[in-house]
């Protein structure tokens, strides 16, 4: 070894550290690939083995629109994350539970007086629900979600229960795009 040169293992270690730092920055600020569990987003996402692609440039609610699927910190337990669909934006009037007047969500008793009532979503908050309303703990339970808890927008998912290859390049491991399902009826009628 000559003066001023590093052994090959030292260069390899240096490249590995740089790569890890780069991946950490991407994970923190740009993109995340994470698992989802639970029945609240059926049929959009499976109850198990669905992994979602999350874009973090939508963090803190930046650019979020009605109908987008998001990942957020759970307001009642910041150590857990939730995956829900935005069904109300700041200033919107939302019906607390449009599906039924039952006062149970799963096994959890929910305040019966709130059902059938309208709530105005406060500024800086969004109203979120699961696609499977009968099995979802969401804004109907913990009220409007502060936009500061939003970690990103879900744009796609992979279901690892599916075979790796089913003959289509578009369907590797059950890949699917997660679309915004909101249809603005007022805008369409004008």
UniProtKB/Swiss-Prot annotation:
InterPro entries documented for this protein: LexA/Signal_pep-like_sf (IPR036286), Mito_IMP1_subunit (IPR052064), Pept_S26A_signal_pept_1 (IPR000223), Pept_S26A_signal_pept_1_Lys-AS (IPR019757), Pept_S26A_signal_pept_1_Ser-AS (IPR019756), Peptidase_S26 (IPR019533)
Outcome of mutating residue 131 to Y: Abolishes enzymatic activity
Listed CDD domains: S26_SPase_I
EC number(s) reported in the record: 3.4.21.-
Gene Ontology biological process terms in this record: protein processing involved in protein targeting to mitochondrion; signal peptide processing
GO CC terms in record: mitochondrial inner membrane; mitochondrial inner membrane peptidase complex; mitochondrion
A GO MF term: serine-type endopeptidase activity
Keyword Mitochondrion in record: yes
Domain of life: Eukaryota
Keyword Protease belongs to the record: yes
Subcellular location: Mitochondrion inner membrane
Active site: 40, 84
Keywords, sorted A to Z: Hydrolase, Membrane, Mitochondrion, Mitochondrion inner membrane, Protease
Purpose of the protein: Catalytic component of the mitochondrial inner membrane peptidase (IMP) complex. IMP catalyzes the removal of signal peptides required for the targeting of proteins from the mitochondrial matrix, across the inner membrane, into the inter-membrane space. The two catalytic IMP subunits seem to have non-overlapping substrate specificities. IMP1 substrates include nuclear encoded CYB2, mitochondrially encoded COX2, NADH-cytochrome b5 reductase and GUT2.
Family membership noted in the UniProt record: Belongs to the peptidase S26 family. IMP1 subfamily.
Complexes and interactors: Component of the mitochondrial inner membrane peptidase (IMP) complex which at least consists of IMP1, IMP2 and SOM1.
Name used for this protein in its record: Mitochondrial inner membrane protease subunit 1
